[in-house]
């Protein structure tokens, strides 16, 4: 609300500069699609998809099907980002983006995008880390079982 009521579309206000380079700007943009404007014009699909993701994640968290705090935190960030962008899509028909980092030539984005991306990355990292731990534990258990069987057969041979 602050951005679209106080700025003109495409207007940019430098926040952090180094020399002649504006590193961080508040730039008012509207995005009728998803990330990088993909699925532009597919508002109904984006609204329904986002709503389904939010409902599924809330169900998984509230029904206690997901118990690990790291998963819950990650999913909460995804839900928060989804709700933020969903509100924009329903009210405005598009998402208001305003964070413009120019040290890398990157798309303008918003706080909801940050939440969704950090949540998705966190969930991915935690799931992969847990899978690696589980595989290591299975290998250790196999080695322990195999060592125990060797010791048992050695003792039986005596």
Predicted regions and their residues:
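Alpha-helical transmembrane bundles and membrane-interface segments of multipass inner-membrane proteins
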Residues: 1-158
């Amino acid at each position: 609300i602050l951005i679209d009521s106080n700025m003109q579309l495409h207007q940019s206000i430098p926040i952090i500069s180094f020399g002649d380079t504006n590193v961080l700007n508040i730039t008012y943009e509207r995005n009728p699609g998803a990330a990088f404007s993909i699925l532009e014009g597919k508002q109904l699909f984006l609204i329904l998809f986002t709503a389904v993701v939010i409902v599924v994640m809330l169900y998984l968290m509230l029904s206690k099907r997901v118990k690990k705090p790291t998963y819950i935190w990650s999913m909460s960030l995804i839900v928060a980002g989804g709700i933020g962008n969903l509100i924009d899509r329903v009210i405005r028909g598009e998402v208001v983006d305003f964070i413009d980092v120019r040290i890398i030539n990157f798309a303008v984005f918003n706080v909801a995008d940050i939440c969704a991306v950090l949540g998705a990355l966190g969930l991915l990292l935690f799931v992969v880390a847990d899978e690696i731990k589980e595989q290591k534990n299975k290998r250790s258990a196999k080695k322990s079982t195999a060592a125990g069987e060797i010791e048992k057969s050695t003792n039986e041979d005596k």
